[in-house]
Structure formats: C-alpha cells, structure tokens
C-alpha cells in the first residue's frame, strides 16, 4: 500500500491516523520553562541545547560576537547552528551581542591571569539581563568540567557568582 491508515476504535469514539513516527523522546519542549542558551559556535553548546530541550526546556540563544577577534564566518556558523537545532528545541530567538568593546576594556584594564574569567562573568551578566527581559528562568551553557583550564570548579563558581539565574550545564 502507498499509505497505511490506522483506525482505533474506543468506547467513546474512533481515532483515524497514519503510521506512528518515532520522536526524539523526552518531555514536550516548553513544559519545563524557558532558558537562554549560550551558543558559542562549537559543538558543546548545541548539544547542551538539545539535551535541555529533551527535558522540556524552551530555549532562546545568545552569541557574543567580537570582530575582529571573531570573524563574520563564526557569526554565520552560529546562525546556522541555531537553525539546525530549531527542529529539536522549538521556536527560538537568537540574540547576537556585539562584544568587542567589553572584551577590549577587560583586556586593557585587568591582569592577564583574570582575563578569561572576567570575560565569562561579563558575558553571564549580559546574558542574565537579556534572559530576564525574555522571560527566561535559567541560562544554559555547553561547559564541560576541565575541558580547558578555565573550566575548573573554582572558575565555574566564580562565573556563577556574577549573576543570579540558575546556570544549567547538562554536559557536566
């Protein structure tokens, strides 16, 4: 047959439908609230978004662009990633934040040893403001513990202290 039609007869009526299609599993997107995903352009942040969507979280995304330190190609990659995961995360918004001036300010005024953690704290503060304006209840990151030197427990605690929303890290 070209198309299989299924008829389910119940005490109170009948259902007519096509064949079952296996979904991704998990909870319906949006049933667990809404969060802002920090979309970096690497593989970890879209994987984190996918995992949180499977747990029912609706998502928006934020990306920090700082040309000339990051390229236009990197921004296009992030936009493509956001579109790629939309079928799994539901309707989303992508916020691209120009970050060159804050990055240069931190570089010019902070000790080199604190540069990365201060940038992360600054990004978290900005993300926190946007998340609240969008009605989001948490932030999501693709951070992995000790993947890089700045992702230690102490560094994560320092980043967390910069803002007040819960930070969900499904890859840890």
Where are these regions (language model features)?
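Conserved beta-strand termini and adjacent loop/short-helix elements that scaffold enzyme active sites
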Residues: 1, 97-99, 170
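RNA-binding accessory domains that recognize and position tRNA/RNA substrates
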Residues: 1-36, 46-93, 161
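A short acidic, often aromatic-flanked loop/helix-cap motif at beta-alpha or helix-coil junctions
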Residues: 4, 101-104
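Active-site adenylate/phosphate-handling loop in enzymes that bind or generate adenylated species
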Residues: 19-32, 103-104, 109-172
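Structural beta-sheet core signal
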Residues: 37, 61-63, 96, 141, ...
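Conserved G/P- and acidic residue-centered "switch" motifs that form tight phosphate/ATP-binding loops
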Residues: 42
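Conserved active-site and cofactor/substrate-binding residues in soluble primary-metabolism enzymes
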Residues: 47, 73-80, 97, 114, ...
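Histidine- and/or cysteine-centered catalytic micro-motif in compact active-site loops
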Residues: 64-65, 99-100, 143-145
